[in-house]
Structure formats: C-alpha cells, structure tokens
Amino acid sequence: RGRLDARRTLKSLVADLRLIISGHTNLAASVANKTILKTLNERLPEAEIVKLDELYPDFKIDVEAEQQKLLRADIIVLQFPLFWYSAPSILERWMEETFRHGFSHGSTGDKLKGKKLVLSFTTGAPEALYSHKGAMGYTIDEFLACYKATCRLTHMEYSGSVYTCGVSYGNRTTPELIEQQRNISVAHTERLIELLETL
C-alpha cells in the first residue's frame, strides 16, 4: 500500500507541474509583469518560470531545451503584456520555434495533447476601450482567438485567461502610482493562482 500511495503522490505532483513563460521583451523596465512573476515565484516555488528576454536577448531560441520544458509541464501559462493586440515579439518567436510540425501538430505531432494553456496578461489601455464601440473596436476575448485556434490545432485545452488593464508606463509618474500598480499586479496574481488551483 505504501508504494501505491507513493505512486499516487508522484502522479499528483507530476499533474501539478506548471510552466510559466514570461514574454515581456524588457522585464527589467516592467512594474506589472515583473511583480506578477515575483509573486508567482513566492507563491508557487515549484513552478518553472522562464524569462525569455533574459534567456534569449538575441532571439535565438534553444528549441530542444524549450520543447523539453513543454514536455515536463501539465499546465502552461503565458505571461505577457499585450503589445499591438498580440503577444510581444519574443513570445511570438518562442512559439514559432518551439511549436513545430511533428512536435506540436501534424500527423505525428501530439506532444502537447491534453496540456492546459492559460493566458495571463496586462494591457496599458483601460478595459472600457476594448469593446465594439470603444477605441479598440474589439473585445479582449476576440483578440485571444489565435491562442484558442492554437489549442485546437495542437489538442491542448484552452483553460482561460486572467488579465489586468490600465497598467501603462504613463501611469508610473509618482511613487504612489507605481505602488498602486504593484498592488494591482499582486491582486492579478491571486486571481491567476485561484484559476490554476481549479485545473
């Protein structure tokens, strides 16, 4: 029985493995995303956090290493600021390089099948602008269609998103405003962890 319990415990640990990919192109200059990652590291020390801007400043992705991280994970979190209605260039590059035919999709590409994908992101503009009548012309959810399509192609499970709006660089003009962004970002992390705990 002891061995059976040990196997169950191991299975539980494996099932809870989380990979968090930071797609900010300049994390050192960030407040919101940097705070979110710092809080995640404190609250989920077992999670693997990958900071793409630090690992690959030249955008030369180590495909094999990144694919191995994906293989180990059960839940994949993409953490990023929304740049021009999409992920930053380094995160796009990471996906282009690691989600390769024969690995993530295609007749023999089933390595991501069944893994859960969660989006965690921030925007500079207020949420009210993301509507059909607002300045952006589309809802936030509509901008996420490409990730849902990616999940469909790779047979991953799209497991939802957590986002925080209105945390722009322009709102960091005083120490008080910077601290406010940090507090908002900690609250964002709490919501993200709540979502992860349901998966």
Roles of regions detected by a PLM:
Residues 15-46, 182-183:
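N-terminal beta1-alpha1 ligand-phosphate binding loop
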Residues 22, 51-53, 162-163:
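Residue-level recognition of beta-strand->loop/alpha-helix junctions
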Residues 46-58:
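A short beta-strand-loop structural module common to alpha/beta enzyme folds
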Residues 31-35, 61, 89-93:
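Generic recognition of short, well-ordered alpha-helical segments
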Residues 56-64, 173-174:
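Structural motif
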Residues 64-148:
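Helix-loop-strand module that forms the ligand-binding subsite of alpha/beta enzymes
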Residues 1-13:
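N-terminal amphipathic/basic-hydrophobic helices that include classical n-h-c signal peptides
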Residues 37, 148-199:
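Glycine-rich phosphate/pyrophosphate-binding loop and the adjoining helix
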